[in-house]
């Protein structure tokens, strides 16, 4: 970890942490008769809520803001009967159970929620997300960094809402996203997904507006989990400079599974508006990086992603932790000690206890555990009557509840108990609800084995809590190899939950383990599980994120070019020259080059710009002459250059002229055959041949594999062609070979020779081939006469608005306002003076001129 990331020094610049989660730490119920709110502490998400609570501790170095949805709200009546309106029970909830939550109810909720946290010694500003945020006229203030597009200040103004609205918003996350992240293909049809998506985007916008209305400069926004995937982008649209950190608590699937989502691009672009993205394990970060590369075609490394907006997003792993001191203290408390004694009297030392606690989701793996336990009793009969499995199941948050899993679980429990049970022995004890906390910690303290058999899972807190409670007993932990916890607790016994026989053998081995072996294993487990507390985890996460945000800012080597910087020199200039690259500069790079065509708006902008008698506008592209003529040939005022200058059509010239006659192209046959070898090895790639160049294009191939192939291909080509006067140009998704004579530096010098004296130069490009163009204009202020002296005597035919003998073409020693603009990331080595994030920003700038 970077220096200083362990402490609070890196994040000292942040005054507040705006913590954003789907729900508050409590479940809320509203009595429809008395209009009184009651809160019940959530039993799930203990690690998350414990970490969040530590931010509101009086000793925290930051002030805290808690942003969350109050729902789903339970409704109680005068007789205290509660009608659940949780999302997982939506199928059985009647409309009569829905009530209107008035502005007065919402104000009382805020007051009660603040009191709830203060009783727990938590000081934080509470921001409940009920629904749409009202806009009121904006007062002049420097207290918020809001983009110009936001003309009104956001203000939280309460409105009446129906309680059912609080459960509709996140249903897309529960019914679709959860499935995909846990390697399950969504079962909802397109129409159902479309309706859920509309609610999801609206719900996410409510969150964004509430955050914007409460944001202050100096805040760090910390967003939790997949339900809020869209939130970073929605915030970024209104707070362009806000530091945003996103932490995914769920697993992340492979790109092949993620691409099943119809809204895959929107979801990825939503979360990629964060500055920093953190996940539970290294494998999840690898899957995420691979998905961004394969689905969006973005450039990635093991630590960051370069987005299409020209920004860099840092990605790393940081596993959550439990509140170890609290759990350890609870296990040694008097109430828990009494429960431990009761359990020991029920289950004497000759009976071994196996404990499991799972939410009844489609990926919980409870049935796998039960089948493995049955295998144990079949193949190792000595344990009949001597081992008991205590299984606790609970309903999950959201729409992930599986009726099928519940039925299978109950049937298996009944089958095992009927096969192997007796009057004085029940092999499986199944609790359908969470236990009292004292009973739960007592059970964890006395159990000989804890078993996690999930078929997909992130960080399982029960496994961590079990280790924290076992310092005296030193029990064994069996983990599914598909659980994210397996990457942290390396001393646990890993099993494939689908292999029931091996699973049963592992249970038998743990039951027969010697005390010495148990102690040795547990010693390692203890160190791994208690290496940090939940407070230490979230502090480290914030400090690491703060360090990365600061590092990203320090890497910005070129300033952003704005309209205000450009407009004065532009208006003062008498003769202006524009040199514009095409792919990746004027238009976004596309996975298929035939899709990367200019928009009508761009063509109108270029025509208007080139029609100004003081402007000389050239488009410099590696595209073929045919493509340039087809898409931009109608704009006679434009100068066009194809294949890096092999052919040009000057402004107002009626025809193209070749600049690459009599070049040695004997190398093309060799390169073509060599590229064909890589086409056969790389499915989806192809060869694109032009008159004077040849390219191997791999934008439609597997991104990771094709990059590896490209590096190998380039290395071999450099050795093969070292005796030829050619240049090998690696680009974003292709590898091109062309004569050294043809490059943007040489073509720009010839354009300058023909254009004569200019006092304003604007050149823009996005990759290495454009650095030759930028190099021509070193230093920033150059002498026209000095530049022309270096230019080759070859001249282009054709004319612009003056002829070659005009006064405008006479070389003068004029100071030139030069703008070399890189399109894309700001921290790449470049000779440019400024940067613009993306082609659309360049298009907007040119349009405004």
UniProtKB/Swiss-Prot annotation:
Catalytic activity annotated for this protein? alpha,alpha-trehalose 6-phosphate + H2O = alpha,alpha-trehalose + phosphate
| Alphabetical list of CDD domains matching this protein | GT20_TPS, HAD_TPP
Cofactor(s) annotated in UniProt: Mg(2+)
Q: What is the main EC category here?
A: hydrolase
Its EC number is: 3.1.3.12
A GO CC term? alpha,alpha-trehalose-phosphate synthase complex (UDP-forming)
User: What GO MF terms are annotated?
Assistant: metal ion binding; trehalose-phosphatase activity
Q: Name a biological process GO annotation.
A: trehalose biosynthetic process
Read off the InterPro entries from this record: Glyco_trans_20, HAD-like_sf, HAD-SF_hydro_IIB, HAD_sf, Trehalose_PPase
Quick one: where is this thing mainly located? cytoplasm
Q: In which pathway does it act?
A: Carbohydrate biosynthesis
Where in the cell does this protein reside? Answer: Cytoplasm; Nucleus
The superkingdom listed in its UniProt entry is Eukaryota
Q: Does the keyword Magnesium apply?
A: yes
- Residues of the region (Glycosyltransferase) are 1-558
The protein's role, per its UniProt record: Phosphatase catalytic subunit of the trehalose synthase complex that catalyzes the production of trehalose from glucose-6-phosphate and UDP-glucose in a two step process.
Family under the similarity heading: In the N-terminal section; belongs to the glycosyltransferase 20 family.
User: What name does the UniProt record give this protein?
Assistant: Trehalose-phosphatase
Provide the organism lineage as a comma list. Eukaryota, Fungi, Dikarya, Ascomycota, Taphrinomycotina
């Amino acid at each position: 970890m970077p220096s200083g990331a362990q402490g609070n020094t890196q994040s000292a610049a942040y005054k507040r942490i705006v913590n954003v989660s789907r729900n508050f730490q409590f479940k809320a119920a509203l009595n429809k008769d008395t209009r009184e709110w009651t809160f019940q502490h959530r039993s799930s998400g203990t690690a998350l809520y414990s970490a969040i609570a530590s931010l509101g501790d009086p000793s925290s170095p930051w002030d805290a803001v808690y942003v969350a949805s109050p729902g789903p709200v339970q409704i109680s009546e005068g007789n205290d009967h509660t009608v659940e309106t949780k999302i997982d029970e939506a199928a059985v909830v009647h409309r009569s159970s829905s009530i209107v939550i008035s502005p007065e109810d919402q104000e009382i909720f805020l007051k009660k929620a603040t009191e709830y946290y203060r009783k727990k010694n938590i000081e934080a500003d509470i921001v409940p997300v009920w629904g749409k945020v009202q806009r009121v006229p904006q007062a002049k203030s420097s207290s918020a960094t809001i983009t110009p597009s936001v003309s009104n200040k956001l203000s939280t103004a309460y409105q009446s809402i129906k309680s059912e609205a609080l459960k509709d918003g996140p249903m897309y996350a529960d019914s679709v996203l959860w499935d995909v992240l846990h390697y399950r293909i969504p079962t909802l049809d397109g129409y159902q997904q479309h309706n859920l998506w509309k609610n999801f985007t609206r719900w996410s916008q409510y969150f964004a507006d509430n955050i914007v209305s409460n944001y202050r400069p100096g805040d760090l926004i910390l967003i939790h989990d997949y339900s809020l995937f869209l939130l970073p982008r929605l915030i970024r649209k209104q707070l362009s400079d806000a530091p945003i950190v996103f932490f995914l608590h769920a697993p992340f699937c492979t790109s092949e599974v993620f691409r099943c989502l119809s809204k895959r691009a929107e979801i990825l672009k939503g979360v990629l508006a964060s500055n920093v993205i953190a996940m539970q394990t290294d494998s999840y970060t690898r899957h995420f990086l691979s998905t961004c590369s394969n689905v969006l075609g973005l450039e990635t490394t093991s630590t960051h992603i370069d987005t299409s907006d020209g920004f860099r997003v840092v990605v790393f792993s940081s596993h959550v932790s439990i509140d170890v001191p609290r759990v350890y203290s609870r296990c040694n408390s008097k109430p828990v000690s009494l429960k431990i004694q009761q359990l020991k009297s029920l289950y004497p030392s000759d009976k071994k206890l196996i404990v499991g606690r799972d939410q009844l989701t489609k990926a919980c793996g409870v049935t796998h555990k039960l089948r493995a336990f049955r295998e144990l009793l079949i193949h190792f009969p000595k344990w009949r009557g001597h081992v008991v499995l205590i299984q606790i199941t609970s309903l999950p948050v959201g729409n992930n509840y599986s009726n099928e899993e519940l039925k299978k679980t109950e049937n298996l429990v009944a089958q095992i108990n009927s096969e192997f049970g007796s009057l004085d022995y029940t092999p499986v004890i199944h609790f359908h609800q969470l236990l009292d906390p004292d009973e739960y910690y007592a059970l964890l303290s006395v159990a000989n084995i804890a078993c996690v058999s999930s078929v997909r899972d992130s960080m399982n807190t029960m496994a961590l809590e079990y280790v924290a409670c076992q310092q005296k007993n030193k029990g064994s932990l069996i983990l599914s190899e598909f659980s994210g916890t397996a990457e942290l607790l390396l001393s646990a016994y890993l099993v494939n939950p689908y292999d029931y026989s091996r699973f049963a053998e592992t249970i038998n081995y743990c039951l027969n383990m010697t005390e010495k072996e148990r102690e040795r294993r547990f010693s390692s487990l203890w160190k791994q599980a208690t290496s940090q507390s939940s407070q230490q985890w979230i502090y480290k996460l914030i400090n690491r994120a703060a360090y990365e945000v600061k590092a990203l800012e320090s890497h910005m080597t070129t300033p952003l070019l704005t309209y205000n910087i450009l407009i004065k020199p532009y208006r003062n200039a008498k003769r202006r020259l524009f040199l514009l690259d095409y792919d990746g500069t004027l238009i976004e790079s596309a996975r298929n080059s035939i899709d990367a065509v200019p928009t009508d708006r761009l063509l109108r902008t270029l025509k208007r710009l080139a029609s100004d008698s003081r402007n000389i506008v050239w488009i410099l592209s590696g595209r073929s002459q045919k493509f340039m003529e087809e898409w931009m040939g109608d704009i006679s005022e434009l100068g066009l250059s194809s294949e890096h200058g092999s052919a040009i059509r000057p402004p107002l010239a009626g025809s193209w002229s070749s600049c690459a006659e009599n070049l040695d192209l004997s190398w093309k046959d060799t390169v073509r055959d060599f590229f064909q070898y890589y086409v056969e090895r790389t499915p989806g790639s192809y060869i694109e041949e032009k008159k004077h160049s040849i390219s191997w294009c791999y934008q439609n191939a597997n991104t990771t594999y094709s990059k590896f192939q490209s590096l190998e291909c380039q290395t071999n080509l450099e050795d093969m062609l070292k005796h030829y006067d050619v240049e090998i140009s690696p680009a974003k998704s292709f590898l091109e070979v062309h004569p050294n004579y043809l490059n943007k530096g040489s073509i720009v010098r010839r354009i300058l020779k023909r254009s004569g004296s200019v006092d304003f130069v604007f050149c823009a490009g996005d990759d290495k081939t454009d650095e030759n163009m930028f190099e021509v204009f070193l230093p920033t202020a150059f002498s026209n006469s000095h530049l022309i002296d270096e230019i080759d005597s070859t001249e282009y035919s054709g004319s612009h608005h003056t002829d070659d003998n005009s006064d405008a073409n006479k070389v003068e020693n004029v100071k030139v306002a030069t703008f070399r603009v890189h399109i894309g990331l700001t921290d790449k080595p470049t000779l440019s003076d400024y940067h613009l994030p993306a082609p659309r920003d360049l298009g907007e700038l040119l349009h405004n001129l």
